[in-house]
C-alpha cells in the first residue's frame, strides 16, 4: 500500500494577525481547503516557484488569492509567509521577506 507523506504547514504570525483578518469567511474556507488538500499533500505539485526577488518561495493560487510559502523538502514543511489578494500580494510579501 502507498503511504502518503504529509507536509506540516506553519504560519508566520503576521499571516494570522493581519492577512486572515481581511479575508472574507467564504474565501477563508476555500483557502483552508486548499491548504489541507494541496499544501499538506503535495505542495511541489500544486504550486509554482516564484522569480526574483522571491526566488526561494512558491505560490498556490486559490481563486483571487495567493498563498506564498517557503517549502522545506528535507523536513517536509511549508512556512506560509503571506495570504493576500493577487493584486497586492507580491509587494506586501516582498516587504516581509526581503530586508
Feature locations, PLM:
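A short, surface-exposed loop/turn module that caps and links secondary-structure elements
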Residues: 36-60
Amino acid at each position: 500500500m502507498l503511504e502518503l507523506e504529509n507536509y506540516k504547514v506553519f504560519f508566520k504570525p503576521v499571516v494570522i494577525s493581519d492577512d486572515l483578518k481581511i479575508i472574507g469567511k467564504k474565501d477563508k474556507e476555500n483557502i483552508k481547503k486548499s491548504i489541507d488538500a494541496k499544501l499538506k499533500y503535495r505542495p511541489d505539485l500544486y504550486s509554482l516557484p516564484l522569480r526574483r526577488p522571491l526566488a526561494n518561495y512558491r505560490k498556490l493560487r486559490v481563486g483571487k488569492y495567493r498563498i506564498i510559502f517557503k517549502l522545506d523538502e528535507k523536513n517536509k514543511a511549508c512556512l506560509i509567509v503571506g495570504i493576500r489578494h493577487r493584486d497586492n500580494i507580491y509587494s506586501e510579501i516582498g516587504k516581509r521577506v526581503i530586508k
